[in-house]
Amino acid sequence: MYLIYYYTIIAVATASIANEKIFYDIDSASVYYENFIKQHNKEYTTPDQRDAAFVNFKRNLADMNAMNNVSNQAVYGINKFSDIDKITFVNEHAGLVSNLINSTDSNFDPYRLCEYVTVAGPSARTPESFDWRKLNKVTKVKEQGVCGSCWAFAAIGNIESQYAIMHDSLIDLSEQQLLDCDRVDQGCDGGLMHLAFQEIIRIGGVEHEIDYPYQGIEYACRLAPSKLAVRLSHCYQYDLRDERKLLELLYKNGPIAVAIDCVDIIDYRSGIATVCNDNGLNHAVLLVGYGIENDTPYWIFKNSWGSNWGENGYFRARRNINACGMLNEFAASAVLL
């Protein structure tokens, strides 16, 4: 039965390598859909909304079959997003705006505060694998919800890790503060990580998450200067011409905010994604580590779609293929005071 098989796949979702192949019988889509609704406690306002979601679900099943057919090291399957069409998903659950250059401040220079760095030079010695999580330098996986705020989560995730490296202590900082107080990025309509860093410098710092909790919708700025927990001195945009330099930078300086095309990972369940195309950057994630499994080198990314997506909120993608277009935009990192 599907239900038994579905829970079996969930059980292996965090295995070190995804050897299981999933194939969904499209003719049984309605059975899968009913189980999906129960598993994820889905509610639809009207019968028409339910029917439209089923159309999306059925189309996504075909996408999962196609990805599983061409992927021998990753599993793609039903998850909590499977009733959303891909275009809507990117609009509601991603949020990178690569052409964002305007500002409410007419004197704003988008490169004024973040130093532009082309990383070159001879290769440095690095270990075969490295994971900042194992050093307790990465905070918990968070969930952006129906809000194009990935840019804020990637930026704050970078700052949290930089703080942990500097102070040997994990703290959770406020993404909501960026949604409300950042005058350059566009809140739930998207933004860029380096602009977020620059706005934090302008604002004066960032508060603890507990003092300025995430709402997933924009409100008036209610910043309390006395509660600022972390301040930044400056920030970097890295122009990385090859993945070896990115690996060295990650190992030397800590987790890095990067831009990707997320379309091919929406249905990701586990394993190493060896197919992740770049049809336009639309999402921001935090690069936290790298490794090798069964002779396949991979990156480890922290996402902001909750811990019940992917490998406990993370995904892995093959190295040295510019997976998901990860080298097509500047990587970014903050420097703390």
UniProtKB/Swiss-Prot annotation:
Where in the chain are disulfide-linked cysteines found? C147-C188, C181-C221, C276-C324
Catalytic reactions on record: Endopeptidase of broad specificity, hydrolyzing substrates of both cathepsin L and cathepsin B
State the active site: C150, H283, N303
Any Pfam family matching the protein: Peptidase_C1
What biological process terms from GO does the record include? proteolysis
> What residue stretch is flagged as signal peptide?
1-18
**What keywords does the record list, in alphabetical order?**
Disulfide bond, Hydrolase, Protease, Signal, Thiol protease, Zymogen
Gene3D superfamilies per UniProt: Cysteine proteinases
Question: Which stretches of the sequence are propeptide?
Answer: 19-126
Please give the superkingdom of this protein's source: Viruses
Q: Which GO terms label this protein's molecular function in UniProt? A: cysteine-type peptidase activity
What Enzyme Commission number(s) apply to this enzyme?
3.4.22.50
Q: Which SUPFAM superfamilies match?
A: Cysteine proteinases
Maturation and modification? Synthesized as an inactive proenzyme and activated by proteolytic removal of the inhibitory propeptide.
The record's section on InterPro entries has: Papain-like_cys_pep_sf (IPR038765), Pept_cys_AS (IPR000169), Pept_his_AS (IPR025660), Peptidase_C1A (IPR013128), Peptidase_C1A_C (IPR000668), Peptidase_C1A_papain-like (IPR039417), Prot_inhib_I29 (IPR013201)
Similarity-based family: Belongs to the peptidase C1 family.
Q: In UniProt terms, what function does this protein have?
A: Cysteine protease that plays an essential role in host liquefaction to facilitate horizontal transmission of the virus. May participate in the degradation of foreign protein expressed by the baculovirus system.
Q: What is this protein called?
A: Viral cathepsin
Instruction: Supply the gene name.
Output: VCATH
